[in-house]
Amino acid sequence: MKEINYAEVLVVLTNVDHYQGTTDLTGLWLGEAAEFVDEMTQAGIEVDYVSPQGGFVPLDPRSMKYADSAILKIYESADFKKRALTASLAPQDVNPADYSAIYYTGGHGVMWDFQIILNFRK
């Protein structure tokens, strides 16, 4: 059983890669995750990443236009690329009670994921 670390936060991401009913791309708004992760890291708080399906998390290509140096620093880190964007945890792999907080990222992709994501509250 995992030891509870009350200084650990679960970051909820999206798996949706296009607007429903269209071919227009969407996904995680990078700043929604990266700015939060940067703040947590600076405070010495660890984060884990989960998405409704686990695995790959697409980025909204429009979000890259607004990425500043702090956002890019997180984006370019090996840890973020692996644990957030490539191999996010699936809901069945986490116990929300193990976390002191759950942070739900914003962006357009989560509009279609939210029904699945809301199950974390149960």
Q: Model features per residue range: what roles?
A:
Residues 1-122:
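Extended, subdomain-level signal for the structured scaffold at the beginning of enzyme domains
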